[in-house]
Curated annotation (Swiss-Prot):
Gene3D superfamilies membership: CRAL-TRIO lipid binding domain
Short name of one Pfam family: CRAL_TRIO
CDD domains per UniProt: SEC14 (cd00170)
SMART domains in the cross-refs: SEC14 (SM00516)
The CRAL-TRIO domain, residue ranges: 129-297
Identification of the protein by name: CRAL-TRIO domain-containing protein C589.09, mitochondrial
Origin superkingdom: Eukaryota
Keywords attached to this entry: Mitochondrion, Transit peptide
Length: 388
């Protein structure tokens, strides 16, 4: 997908060489006609990424919460990386990609994604939300390590899932928490070229050992599929269904009809450790699955005051957030200027380099504000996060 998308701009020899065979978007062959007088642009003169920016930012001006949500969505990546994901998931159609991004931002606002991230496990403990915490305490969903493609592995032991003991709201909040947390294990994409050359995604390993129909949760599968397709596009690298018993065949016949072909193509079935070793090193595969990883996940409980930086105001917090937002505004202004340039404009390279520099500053600044906008997780207590 990424290698088929190009942009046409007047580049230096070095930049052309760097972009060769990668991404710098080609012009889309299919773009909708301008709908208003204000859309007096030549669609043959602008690359899809530029068109996406042109279409999206007026919506940010109308709905300030969308801009805020986009900033928080970017996390430790350049904002360009987010735009690239949505464009790639829409086959380079800037109109569709822009609308998909806006829908995602509205979903994040409606779902309260940032509220879930800011409250985290300590809030669940303080409010006696045992449903949320038990899903972590049991080790049902854990970060296992990295696969042979350097993707983080989200390991799900399906036999530990008891849908009858969970409300849909609790399960959906946990799904969002896992999605947002796993993103922090991806390698940061700090420039447009990073987004082109090294798309980052996750390996999801479903361990179906000891699976029974009591563990099946069709509502969860539908919700997860919709999240991957609409709200976290291009996030799934491979989905491994390991040791599926014969009773899973009937289940699979039902759920495969809900999954889009793009996602279905990333699903593989394995039965043995040898099968898994095509994707995961033997040393990472748990001994319970025939591998050499003897480590047993031990959940560490949240501790009092660990999220004080999120809750309390301070001069340091105000200054750090101001810098973070300033870097985003700088990237934003350069990107809006770049999006106005015809692809043949001589200023393309200069302005694009300014975009990348600002995007890199924004991405690098994230870890200075992380403690102010995200509750600590078990992976912070294990000292796994921030060391990707």
């Amino acid at each position: 997908m990424f290698s088929r998308l190009w942009v046409r701009c007047r580049c230096s020899t070095a930049l052309s060489a760097a972009a060769a065979g990668t991404f710098f978007f080609r012009r889309s062959q299919k773009q909708p006609e301008p709908e208003t007088v204000d859309e007096k642009v030549s669609f043959e003169s602008y690359s899809p990424l530029k068109l996406m920016i042109q279409k999206t930012w007026p919506r940010f001006q109308e709905h300030k919460e969308y801009r805020e949500s986009f900033i928080r969505l970017a996390k430790c990546d350049s904002p360009d990386a987010i735009l690239v994901r949505f464009l790639a998931s829409c086959n380079n159609d800037s109109h569709e990609a822009s609308q998909k991004l806006i829908n995602t931002l509205q979903w994040r606002v409606d779902t309260g994604v940032e509220r879930i991230v800011e409250r985290g496990e300590l809030y669940a403990k303080e409010t006696n939300d045992d449903q949320f915490l038990e899903q972590l305490r049991t080790g049902k969903v854990t970060m296992l390590g990295r696969d042979l493609s350097d993707r983080p592995i989200c390991y799900i032991q399906v036999h530990l899932h008891q849908p009858s003991k969970l409300t849909q709201n609790s399960l959906r909040e946990m799904t969002v928490w896992v999605m947002e947390t796993m993103r922090l294990f991806l390698r940061p994409q700090k420039t447009l070229k990073d987004s082109m050359d090294s798309p980052q995604n996750v390996n999801v390993l479903f361990d179906l050992s000891n699976f029974s129909l009591h563990n099946m949760d069709y509502s969860f599968v539908k919700y997860l599929a919709s999240c991957l397709e609409y709200y976290y596009p291009q996030s799934l690298g491979v989905c491994i269904l390991h040791k599926s018993p014969w009773i899973f065949r009937s289940v699979w016949n039902i759920i495969k009809g809900w999954i889009k072909p793009e996602i279905a193509a990333k699903i593989v079935f394995t039965q043995s450790a040898n099968d898994l070793e095509k994707y995961i090193d033997y040393s990472v595969i748990p001994t319970s699955l025939g591998g050499g990883n003897k480590k047993i996940f031990q959940y560490i409980e949240p501790v009092e005051h660990e999220n004080d930086a999120v809750i309390e105001d301070s001069a340091e917090k105000t200054a750090a957030l101001a810098r973070y937002y300033a870097y985003f505004s700088e990237w934003e202004q350069h990107s809006l200027n770049w999006a106005k340039l015809d692809d043949d404009d001589a200023q393309n390279e200069k302005v694009r380099l300014c975009c990348d520099a600002a995007g890199t500053n924004f991405a690098n600044c994230y870890w200075n504000v992380d403690k102010y906008i995200r509750a600590r997780t078990v992976y912070d207590r294990l000292k796994w996060i921030g060391n990707v």
